[in-house]
Amino acid sequence: NGVHNASLLTMSVQSTLVSEGRGLEIQSPVQWSCSQPQDIADIRFMSTISLAPLCEVEMIGGQANEAITIGTSASFSLISTLDIEVLDKGLPVEGATIIVDGQTVQTDALGSATAQTTARTVDAQGDVQEGTKTVTMQIGSFTEFFAWNVQQSTSHTFMASTVPSGTISSWLILEETWSPYRLEGDLTVASNTRMTVNDGVELRIA
């Protein structure tokens, strides 16, 4: 996790920024002259940014909340990333649908998916900063939501635990850790066993 702190960081046309590991934090004001489009990632700009004419910068991940000034035909865009995980009692759920900002993705065999959205654009049209967007997770009729402040890349885990349908013959305990649960069929608890729903558990019946 690198940190740059000086009175001013001046970058010439040959300069670029590379972030490794847990990212680079730049606490200094930045003045950047670039002659070709710059693609950077995971840099936290904690102070102002000034781009010279024709300097185009696109950043995936990271942070840029302070004032950004641009010269003629220059631009800055921040694309935020959301890493999603969907679990069923701790096990990955493949094929869950994730919807955010009109984009639809499916979780893979590891229960993971990634979504991206443009969080900020500074160009000749002005400075457009997006706010909170709703992330929807769907498995059949089961739906969960997450409010994502897109100014910050982040990760989120959805729980989508299943309750077995049919007749259960062993003690079934629903734990808050894996809530919410979903039941998609008839459930019968045999007379010689029991089902325990712990405090804080949410059970949804389709």
Could you say what each language-model-derived stretch is?
Residues 1-6, 22-34, 39-72, 76, ...:
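Extracellular beta-helix/beta-solenoid repeat scaffolds
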Residues 73, 145-162:
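Extracellular beta-sheet/turn segments enriched in Thr/Pro/Gly and aliphatic residues
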Residues 80-82:
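Structural beta-strand segments of beta-rich domains
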Residues 102-125:
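Short, acidic Ser/Thr/Gly-rich low-complexity loop/linker segments typical of extracellular
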